[in-house]
Amino acid sequence: MMIRIGFGYDVHPLVEGRKLIIGGVEIPFTKGLLGHSDADVLYHAIADAFLGSLALGDIGQLFPDNDERYRGIDSGLLLQEVYRRVRERGYCLNNLDAVIVAQKPKLLPFIQKMRENLAVLLNTAIENISVKATTTEGLGFAGREEGIAAYAVITVKEVLENG
């Protein structure tokens, strides 16, 4: 059985007047992430990790930010399309490990719901999904509360027809 690994990273600036959506969860906060879509930084990092695992380019190539079809789109739909392409090539998720980097807000109360959302979107057991959050102890753009970043590492495994 062939196993492949993918790594993804995404970052968006925090701005006033936008909802903060991470991992498909709307999080109460005074600012939200700026982006062409709903700017779900976690879903974007995971999508790039999937694409990287099979050398399929990146999320910006598939869903360009100058294409009006994707303005304000739910990033869960983008992630589902990316995963459909992974499945179409004979692979499925083995496991996912992701980290969200944000000084504020505190994300721990929302992590379980993010994991549940991902398990449903990716049609997998929640045990295959790890999502964590950390701060930068006040350092850098995240520490200054200028933006939020996410990193994701995934492994995909070849789907065997007879086994």
Swiss-Prot record:
Keywords: Isoprene biosynthesis, Lyase, Metal-binding. The keyword RNA-binding does not apply. Binds 1 divalent metal cation per subunit. It catalyses: 4-CDP-2-C-methyl-D-erythritol 2-phosphate = 2-C-methyl-D-erythritol 2,4-cyclic diphosphate + CMP. Its EC number is 4.6.1.12. GO terms for molecular function: 2-C-methyl-D-erythritol 2,4-cyclodiphosphate synthase activity; metal ion binding. PANTHER family: 2-C-METHYL-D-ERYTHRITOL 2,4-CYCLODIPHOSPHATE SYNTHASE, CHLOROPLASTIC. This is 2-C-methyl-D-erythritol 2,4-cyclodiphosphate synthase. It comes from Carboxydothermus hydrogenoformans (strain ATCC BAA-161 / DSM 6008 / Z-2901). The gene is ispF.
